[in-house]
A protein has these predicted regions:
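Asp-box/BNR beta-propeller blade signature and adjacent active/binding-site loops
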Residues: 1-168
Length: 168
């Protein structure tokens, strides 16, 4: 990878540290072939495993990792976004891109060793008039009532940006 960006780190219920980041293949830009990566440490960060590829969608952009650990169940939720690698932020916001930015999740029930396949959440978290959506940066939190509060930004009707957080 040429560049690593948008880091996020959480501690699993077994004490493992999980560090997520985008792996940008062609350069520092925010579009293109971008994969989602994970490195784990089981010794408090003294050593780290080799990067684990969590999501490679070919030439497309997979990123904005936003993890949260449910301390009650131990499940780790990873929220993220995906768009065509040929679509750029300004085009997505202006609705001149080929596709829109979409929202996805993956989960792990074994402290980040293995992960579910990506599952799309766009319809439940992104309003129809929102053109842009980005999870994070950083991590989310679990409220006492079990709600996962995920930081995110969006642009609505190609004019304004707002902050939003929601995920059940």
């Amino acid at each position: 990878y040429h560049t690593y960006r948008i880091p996020a780190i959480v501690r699993a219920t077994d004490g493992s540290l999980l560090a997520f980041a985008e792996g940008r293949k062609a350069g520092q830009g925010d579009s293109g072939d971008i994969d989602l990566l994970l490195r784990r440490s089981t010794d408090g960060g003294a050593t780290w495993n080799q990067p684990q590829l969590l999501w490679d969608d070919g030439p497309n952009t997979c990123g904005n990792p936003c993890p949260v650990v449910d301390r009650t169940t131990g499940r780790i939720h990873l929220l993220m976004t995906r768009n065509l690698g040929t679509d750029h932020e300004a085009e997505i916001i202006a609705q001149t891109s080929t596709e829109s930015r979409r929202v996805w999740t993956m989960t792990s029930d074994d402290h980040g060793v293995t992960w579910s396949a990506p599952r799309e959440l766009t319809a439940s978290v992104k309003a129809p008039d929102w053109t842009w959506y980005a999870t994070g940066p950083g991590g989310a939190i679990r409220l006492r009532n079990g709600t996962l509060l995920v930081p995110a930004t969006h642009a609505a009707q190609a004019r304004r940006r707002e902050v939003q957080g929601k995920y059940d």
